Structures are given as C-alpha cells and as structure tokens.
C-alpha cells in the first residue's frame, strides 16, 4: 500500500487522532505548571559555618582550612572556594554538570558531620544546595506599622502568616527576616551587688534555679499512672523580679532590689527596612515542580483575606513578584502566535488568493502548538521562559512547513482544466514527501548537538531546543499527513485555480532576468559572496559580545557597601539618603532594604547590604537600564561615601548559582599572600579608568571586617588580685554583652533572660571608658580594668578568600555602556601590560566573562557538530559530495548576515544569538533542500542547465512565501513587543530574520550558479 492509498484509507483515523491530540493539548496547557526558569540542578553547594566570635585568621586555621581539606576529598568535587570572616565562614563546593546533586549534598553533609567534633565547641553549620527556588523566593512582602512593635510584627509573620502560607500546596518554605525577638533584660547595679555581697554568678545561678520544669517520676494510684512534674517555671516580669537570693549579712533579697528587670529584644546586627520604615520581611519559596503563577494567586488571595482581620495600623506591601516575568512570557507566546498567524495568513492569501487555503495553514499551526504542549506535559516539563520562548521562536518554522505543502498542493491540484483535482492533492503531497522530510530533518538535526552542551548554557537551552525539536517533529507529521486531508476537504479546486498558472508575475519575471544574468556571468558569484562576507566582517567588528540577553525584569538590586568598620547605625544614616533618592524617583513602585544581610543569604558585614527596587509597569516608564543609570548617577553625586553596584535579581541569581555574579571578576593570587591587598587596590584603581567599567561599582575585594578592641589581660596582675584571665574576660562580657542564663515559655515561644551589669556611666559605653570598668575581685576589692589589662586597638582584619586552598583576592566591577567582551579584553590588556602586576602575582578572570567564554566555546563546538550532521544528512539524501558542500556553504555564508542584524539592532552577540546562528544553518539547509530536490526531479525530464533555471523559478514562490511568513511571524519576537517576555529570545529572532533574508538570494540565485559551475563545460550554457 503506497502513501496515497494509506492516507486515503486512514483519513478519518488521521483526522480524529490529530483533533483528539490537539484537544488533549489544550487540556495539557491548562494543567501545565508555570515558572520563570526550568528546574535545573546547579552543581554547587554552599556551606555556612558559624563558630562564634573569633578573629578571621583564627577562624581560618581552626575552622575553614580543615573543613576545606575534608570537602576537597569528596568524590567528584571540582572546586572549593571559601570566604572567612570573624567567626563565620562561607564555603562553595562545585561539582561537574550532570552530577546527582542530592547525593553530592549528602556527601557534603557527611563530611561536615565528621568534622564537627574536631571544630571549636559550639560550631554550627548549614548545607544549602544552590537551586534558584531554594536561594531566592518567588514572592516577597513586608510588614510595617507606625504603632505595632517589631516584636509583634515578627510574631504575626512567624506564627500566623507563615503557617497559613505553608498550608498552600506547592509552597516549600516561608522565611522571615527582620523584626525583634523578645527577651527579658536584667540590669544589675554593681553598687547594689557589692552592698549585698553578691556576684553576677550568684544572680545567674539563682535565676536558673528558679526556672525549672522537668519530670521527676511517676505515681500509680486509683488504677491510673500519673507523670510527675516539678513546675517552677518563670512566667513573666513579676515572677522574675520576685526571685530571691540568700545573703550572708542581709538575709533574703529580691532580684528587683539588685537592679532593673525590663522587657527587651535580642540584639541583632542587621536591619530590614521597607519604604524607609523598619519592617519584617516575608519570603515565600516554592517547590521545584510547583506552578508559580497559581501559587502567587493563592498567596495573594490568602494574604488579602488575612489582612482584613488585622488592625489597619499594620500594612502589608508586596515588593517582589517573580510571576510578572512569567506573565510577560505567556503574553509573548500568545502575541507571537496570534500576530504571526495573522501575518502569515495574509502572506498565503496574497500569493494564493484563497481564503480556504489560508485557513488550512491557520488550523495546522495552532494544532502543532497544542500537541507540542501535550508532549511537554507528558515529559514532565513546565511552561517557563525557555519552553515558552521555544514555542514563540518556532512559530515561524511551523508556518514554513505548512506553507510549502499548501503551495505544492495548490500548484499541482490548482491547474485549470484538471478533471479530478481532488485526487491530485494526495499525489502532490506524496511527491513533496521526500523534500519535506529532508528539509524537516535538516532543521531538526541541528538540535542533536545541543543536547551535549554543558554548563549553564546547556542547562537552560536544552529546554528551548527540546521544545523546538518537538514542535518541528509534530509540525512535520501534521504537514505530511493532516494538511493534505484538510486541503482536499476544504478547498474547492474546481472553482479555484492556482494564480501561478496564469501569466508570470513581476516577481517571477524579475527573478528570471536576475537568474539569467547570474548564470551567464558566474563571475558575479564570488564578487557577491566576498561583498557579503566583507559586510559581515565589518558588522562583526562593531557587534559587542555578552553572556545572557539583557532582559527588563521590572526591578533591580542595589548592592552597597559603606566604609569598612562603619557601624550599623551610621550605615543606616548614610543609606537614608540613598533611600530618599530611590523613593523620589517617579518610576519606583516599592523598595525594600537589608543592611548586614542579603537577599541570597550571603555573608555580609554590618556595613553591607542590598536594596531591591521594584519599578512601575513597563508601559509607563523607560527601560530598566535608563532608570538604573538615573539612580546610579544621582547616588554617585549625592552619596560619595557609598560604594555600590546595580544588577537585576535573576541575572544576579544565575551568577550566584555558578560563581560570582559580577561581569568582571579578577582573581589575584601570589606566592606571598601578604602583597595581595596592595596589588588589589592598585588593580581596582587601574580598571576604574577603563571605558565600560562603572567606577562606582569597582570593589577591590579587600573587605575589612571592622576594627576591633582587644582586652589583653596581664596574668601576673590578675593573679595578685586572685583572678584569672577568664574571670576578667567574663566580667567585661557582663558589662558589654551579658549572658542569656535561661529561657521561659512565653505567649509565643521561648523568652530568654539576659543578665548584664550596668556600666558606671549611664547610656552606652564609649571606647575611652573601657579601661575604667570596675572589676570585682573575689575578696570584694574593686579596681579598674586597666589595673589588670590593657585595651588595644586592632585595625580591621580583611575577610580571607581562598580558592582550592590558595588565598586570593577578587577585584570585581560592573559593566556599563559597553559590551562585556570588549571590556574584558581591555581588562586583560591592562593586566598583561608590564608593570601592572608585580612579579609573583598571577590572575585569572571569572564571573560572567568566564561563563561567556565557556558558553561560546561550547556553541562553537555545537555549530561545528551541526554542520557535520547536516553534511551527513545531505550525503544520505543525494549520495554525492559537491551538492552538500554547496548547500552548507550557502548556509554558512548566510550566517554572516547575523552580525549585520545584531549591529543594526544594537544587540550583543550572546548565547541566544549564537543559538540563532546554529538554527540558520538548519533553516538555510532546509530552503536549499527544497530547491535541490526540485532540481533533481526536473533533471529527469530536461537538461541540467535548464533544470537549474526552471527549478529556481518553480521554487521562487514557496521559498519566498515561507521566508516572508517566517520573518513576519518572528517580527513580534524580534521587536520585543511584549517587553521582558520577548527579550530573552529577541537575539535569536533577530539572528534568524537576518539569516533567512540573505539565504533567500543565496538559494534562488547563488546556488544555481554554484551548481552550474560543477556541470561539464558542455552543459554550462543553455
């Protein structure tokens, strides 16, 4: 049974199956989860270690170095990077792409658990797998109030809002940041203690002894078993004040007689501010497979209902919403399909002048989209910026398939005077099956090498390539088997005749004259090719290079750092001016600030932090980069003491997943690490003068943890007073920090009781008062601290950064007004210049530039592999070598036009644009296959020279129709009419549009000439 008979016999089954799959696809679309990015397992683990308060150098020796050594021994661990500060360490462990990260995380946790016994007492750690949905929330809110305390706001967030939201299916975690935690502060009067002959330890022990709640046994009576409790727990301020102590000379004394007992809050060295007011931040995280859009809707609905039950004095503000990007991507696909279909339909209507023929194309393309969605659903994928972008970018290719089939059917079955045109429809489809199969394979085969692309590029773009490959396969099947059945059923060929059988139109006549001239004067071929390549080369020189496409996310992060050692309070004062600038910008909708903390949970000092700024609707403002520049310039001019950088959150987030997020990262290493800080300062000053480097964003990588005051006890003097160094240290601690001696159960959890000793002077202690702190000896003698110790100023010790056990310093900078590639090249030239780096100091570049270089090398490999795959396919199709070489040559030459398109539109050559280059190779080959297949068919009935000419004329209309339709279908994506939803795929669309426009004359003019040159000399002239 041949193709025609088989399709004829199963036409009803084919129709029902296609319609059923399309309907199932509609239901799949309704059930598909939505997200910003696909679920990607980044091969990176973060370990946060807290060992109390200790100098950075001691933390390195006691904690960081041994832990690094243990982690480096984990199987498959590639890199171990660490940052060590006072009592804190942050370590990153990198693994190869494709590693089972659940097992890798277990390996890290196992190594850490084995290390804990050998670490300083009290050391705690947390192991975090670097996943976007773990590191960053999809939605964030702030609670503020002018009358409700921060303690009550935190309780509201922790004990009411968080549990409510955790009840929503798909929510993995709800975190809070900011607010105050209640504690009771016992301030002891040193004079009263001396008068009653008591010590701080006496008071602490009495409080602890008075707060007991423990089981003391069981009692059986009356056939029942009772559990016995000793319940002498404290209940509040009154019960604490009434605690009694026994004295030798004064009998029993109440705690209230020794000082004051008041409500207080746990000290914290970070701030969270929303719209300039102290706030409690609520961050909502989703499970990896959850539908972020429906989650956000439910979260918003539940919070709106909850806030109706709260006092009006409490305000809830949403300052981050990731689903806005998803909505924009969905809108981009919808607009792409609708606009693309309408424009492509107009193209079909213009050339064929038949509404029903146009309707066939308008039906097949949406069916291909819905069935593709069904396949994605079955594969467990989600709608995200990659899969949605793949659907939007594939619209032009889907239209291309059905257009050439409809044109073939129209040309064969629309012949005037044909007795049985309906019977010719399937015959025409059968004739076209081989070129259609070859052309479809030419496009599909380029996606095979992309499956082997590694790194962050492969992780993201494999979803886009898989989506497009599935769409093209579905489109091929619908075009080959369903479109002919629709065409035969819907088009009345007895009443309608193909316009191509009428008098040749102006386009065909023009093409014929150009083709005749090219065939007669083949010398114009190399001239034209060289001219095209020359223009492409010039465009390439003027086209910048980048990593990922620039995308307006609707908000950005303002990372800041005041001078090292600046107190939290002073940093807050300086940032008030920055907040005022942001608040007064008319394009800002909301903002939230963290000082001493960060969005991604990174290691931060009290003089560091970030501000997330959410902008108003994109339709009511300039693009985000102009707004960022406005704020940057204003802060630079008005707040000179603040070092800062701006970046968009998701871009910054992706950078954190694979390394440093900054575009320029210079890793400096030296045989003598002591010279690194000075070298880093010099390098930072030098790169600040490079065009493209934002001077305000340059960070020398030297991050002092703030100055310190060391209490150095004279052991001999302490011994003479009957004390040890630890005794002196403890009493100083009682003045400064105090000690939490016990906890009692309050209304909303445990409440700590902190015991402190009031300083001799009222208010906060000053540096010059420390040496006069009264120290009490065991014999009752009181003397100033300076009698047994001296207070020494210690300049701030920088954080210590290491990579694979080697100390480094990382100088970073943001790029502005210039592309990343040329800026990094300028940095390299500077660093390679003699005298910039002293002998023994080496450097490597990291950050986004490193990722860009890795991605470009990978894409070059993909392009080469795709070219080889195309040649192999063409060899199977034609079983000769010259034709594949000519076809691939025309496609490669068309790729040069991509640089022209990027230059004209001002878009950088990034990974998405390079993806478009690879696709041009396939699309160009597809167009060439249409021509060569027609040429080979005509060679059976006419001389080859004549067949070259006639095949080009015959394929003019279908190729022109497909090119025009594809350009128009991709135009909304290339123009980014939907804003951020289009911007990720905009370079790809521009690359394809530029490439296929040039490929049109390459196939219809250059290729006939090139093939003609391979003919025997006797056949070259017709």
Describe each PLM feature range.
Residues 6, 48, 116, 164-342, ...:
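Extracytoplasmic/periplasmic membrane-proximal domains and adjacent transmembrane bundles
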Residues 25-30, 342-350, 354-411, 470, ...:
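Hydrophobic transmembrane alpha-helices and their membrane-interface caps
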Residues 1-15, 415-427, 456, 462, ...:
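Interfacial helix-loop-helix hairpins and adjacent transmembrane helices
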Residues 319, 326, 330, 392, ...:
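Helix-loop junctions and hydrophobic alpha-helical segments within the transmembrane domains
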Residues 394-409, 433-452, 459-499, 611, ...:
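Transmembrane alpha-helices and their membrane-interface boundaries in multi-pass membrane transporters
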Residues 12, 20-58, 113-123, 377-381, ...:
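Transmembrane helices with small-residue packing motifs
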Residues 1-34, 430-432, 499-548, 629, ...:
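Signature of alpha-helical transmembrane segments and their immediate interfacial
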Residues 3, 8, 58-130, 191-212, ...:
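Solvent-exposed, membrane-proximal periplasmic/extracellular interface segments of envelope transport
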